[in-house]
A protein has these predicted regions:
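Residues in well-ordered beta-strands of folded domains
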Residues: 33, 47, 76, 118, ...
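Helix-to-loop junction immediately C-terminal to a conserved catalytic motif
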Residues: 19-50
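Catalytic core of membrane glycerolipid acyltransferases/transacylases, capturing the structured
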Residues: 40-104, 109-110, 121-138
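Non-catalytic C-terminal accessory region of glycerolipid acyltransferases
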Residues: 1-15, 106-250
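Sequence-level motif detector for i,i+2 pairs with an aromatic at +2
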Residues: 27, 41, 70, 112, ...
Length: 250
């Protein structure tokens, strides 16, 4: 019987999906820089930009950090994804946990794990193509409070290429969830279009860790830190875009 940790993750390393690993290497051709900024031990909150219908960015970061830096990554996801039959258990198996302050604190502070969050939330994946690579507001700074309370550093990870794999052209809303309608959906149809991604070259840059331990947790200070981190990531992303010669070849 497969062994799992208390979060439901398979304990024999990240379960391997051959097709996804092949896509990581040969389809998206993911390249990293700044991996020395990933802490070798202890908890850390990884913060990244977010994009696309059925976004692969989370899985790419999880797989990449484990392959390149040797540490597993737990990802926090909206509770709505766990409402579908069997999906929740499958997500848990690959290290995805319901996004909740208590879960984040236990992973970071008690278990000293790397935890990945996307502060843009749904605003990232559902933004129009005209806003491509413009980072949306980082909520109310909840991720900053999470890192402060867990006494761990924040490590920004900037992804370039993910928004070209599934360009958003519209969106629909179901309850409190919003779903992007992508160009892939239009070309490949409602089912295949959710999974077929264009072969954009993806680059990931890990920025220097940000230590906020001991800082004031007042709302205004938290919001200032969140905006400062968003601005730093946007600047890095702008630099990466400026250097890029082709969205398909990097």
């Amino acid at each position: 019987m497969e062994k799992r940790d208390r979060w439901g993750r398979a304990t024999e390393g990240t379960p391997k999906i051959a097709l996804f690993e092949a896509a990581y290497r040969s389809w998206f051709r993911v390249e990293w820089e700044g991996l020395e900024n990933i802490p070798e031990e202890g908890g850390a909150l990884l913060v990244s930009n977010h994009a696309g219908m059925m976004p692969v960015d989370g899985g790419l970061v999880q797989l990449g950090v484990e392959k390149e830096a040797g540490r597993p990554v737990y990802m926090l996801a909206h509770h709505g994804f766990f409402a579908f039959p069997y999906v929740g258990r499958l997500l848990n198996r690959f290290g995805t946990v319901v996004a909740h302050p208590n879960n984040a604190h236990r992973l970071l502070h008690e278990d000293e794990r790397l935890v990945l969050v996307f502060p843009e939330g749904e605003k990232g994946p559902v933004k129009p193509t005209s806003e491509r690579y413009r980072l949306q507001r980082f909520g109310r700074g909840g991720f900053v409070e999470t890192a402060m309370r867990a006494q761990v550093p924040i490590v920004p990870i900037v992804l370039m290429g993910t928004e070209d794999t599934t360009p958003t052209i519209a969106r629909i809303s179901v309850g409190d969830l919003h779903y992007p309608i992508t160009l892939n959906f239009v070309i490949f149809g409602p089912i295949l279009g959710q999974f077929a991604h264009f072969p954009a070259k993806i680059r990931a840059r890990v920025l220097s860790p940000i230590d906020l331990v001991g800082r004031s947790e007042s709302r205004s200070v938290v919001m200032d830190h969140a905006e400062s981190i968003r601005s730093e990531m946007q600047t890095a992303l702008d630099e990466m875009i400026a250097r890029r010669e082709s969205r398909w070849f990097g």
